[in-house]
Amino acid sequence: MNENIKYDCVIIGSGPAGLTAAIYNARADIKTIVIAGNQPGGQLTITPMVDNYPGFPNGIGGFKLMMDIQNQVKNFGVEIKQGIVKKISGNFQIELENGEILQSRSVIVATGAAVKWLELPREKELIGHGMSSCATCDGMFFRDKTVAVVGGGDTACEDAVFLSKFTKKVYMIHRREEFRASMAEQKKVLNNQKIEILWNSEVRELIGEEKLTSVKILNNKNGEEKVLELDGLFVAIGYSPATKFLGGLVELRETGQIVTGKNEKLATMTNVEGIFAAGDCVNENHRQAIIAAGEGCRAALEAQRWLRN
């Protein structure tokens, strides 16, 4: 693509926020392209069933929902380009990792958030070989086996309950002495006889050559260590916003989320005029598809207003 071709708006990210923004831009005749990113469709594509998105009384698979939205975007004539953004220059030149450069009048960042791993030696080698961040994707490989979930929030509790349906035993390894999850999710875990909770515990070592066979656990309250034999370890300790590529261009929180809202009339705009943001790369409290979609809509409408002025 010729680097001189200029877009009205480049949307970075293809989850609910990015694709919704694309729909609203297309309807307003704003020349738009979507850069899909390293997980086209976003995190929702690995969610087996979404039952809280309005309009689907019987629920809908996350992958199907995102493919339907993607097709809707394409039907409006918006190009969805496979690629990852390397950096954005101050004049809104968007450079992709393959060296291609796009020129735009405005940018909507909707890159979402990536899985937080334990950052232990050999972790990368063991991902897919006993280690996973997606219980719904990989859980069935551990039927009648012993697994553990690391974390204490809603996702960790949901994963543990899901895994208990077909595994032999589930450990929950949590570094605190109480969960951060909602009471509803906590009750499901606490009332499940197949789930054993290891409070005040942290994974300190991953053991196994070609695949994970056990982990070394430290009790951070009494200092005791023990080895836990496992067939699988599921990490559910949160997500990191995919914002490193911004490289100091826009203001970020300490957690990496993009700061917006300083302009009362353009609530989704960053501290850089013409760069807007929406979805999980902004919102650190509520990782919900419907919220991301709504923010994507607002970002598009506000980008349109800014472009007109």
Segments the model singles out, each with a brief description of its role:
Residues 7-76, 157-183, 253:
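Beta1-alpha1 glycine-rich phosphate/pyrophosphate-binding loop at the start
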Residues 119, 125-141, 237-291, 295:
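FAD-site-proximal beta/loop scaffold in flavoenzymes
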Residues 80, 109, 133, 197-199, ...:
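A structural signal for the hydrophobic beta-strands that form the central parallel beta-sheet
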